[in-house]
Design a protein with these regions (language model features):
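Short, surface-exposed secondary-structure boundary micro-motifs
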Residues: 107-108, 113
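Short acidic-glycine-tyrosine-enriched beta hairpin
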Residues: 90-107
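A short beta-loop-beta micro-motif enriched in histidine and acidic residues
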Residues: 44-49, 59-76, 90, 97
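Short, conserved beta-strand element in jelly-roll/cupin
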Residues: 53-57, 69-86, 124-127
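Conserved catalytic-core motifs of eukaryotic protein kinase domains, centered on the activation segment
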Residues: 89-91, 114-115
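A short, N-terminal "cap"/entry segment at the start of jelly-roll beta-barrel domains
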Residues: 1-58, 134-146
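A short hydrophobic beta-strand segment most commonly corresponding to one strand
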Residues: 49-53, 101-103, 116-133
């Protein structure tokens, strides 16, 4: 492995300084069922990475349409609270509960099929912005984090 060429700045994010927010579609949230707490990682790494905590909008319902991410090298999810179910194309259905995690390889079609009312997940991506494609019609869902 070669040492990364990007520069990063010191980042300290305090819980009380951030809040969960819905992201506008043009800001890259194809999942209006969720709220995002941005941790500042994308800014601190010049876009090389992103990290955010995601929680469900009360009363929101699954499923999330099957999709895949392109121009994405790394997607990691760690369940902090509750549970979330995923269907991975060719790999079946998996329910992740608090303490479980997954890495989704670039281009693997998947969908979110369910979640608990109290779900919270940590999602880390590289790079911070990437494309999300609806696999049913091949249309780009959003140009950024998904």
């Amino acid at each position: 492995m070669q040492k990364s060429e990007f520069r990063q700045s010191l980042l300290v994010t305090h819980f009380e300084d951030t809040k969960f927010e819905a992201l506008e579609a043009n800001n890259g949230a194809p999942r209006p069922q969720f709220l995002y707490r941005q941790l500042g990682v994308e800014q601190a790494t010049g876009g090389a990475y992103d990290a955010h905590v995601i929680k469900g909008v009360p009363g929101s319902k699954p499923p999330i349409a099957e999709h895949k991410h392109t121009e994405l090298d790394f997607l990691f999810v760690y369940v902090l609270k509750g549970w979330m179910s995923f269907h991975y194309h060719g790999h079946g259905e998996h329910r992740l509960k608090a303490g479980d995690c997954h890495i989704i390889p670039p281009g693997l079609s998947h969908t979110v099929t369910g979640w608990s009312e109290d779900v919270e997940i940590l999602e880390i991506t590289a790079p911070g912005h990437y494309k999300t494609i609806d696999t049913a019609n091949g249309v780009e869902v959003a140009p950024a984090t998904a």
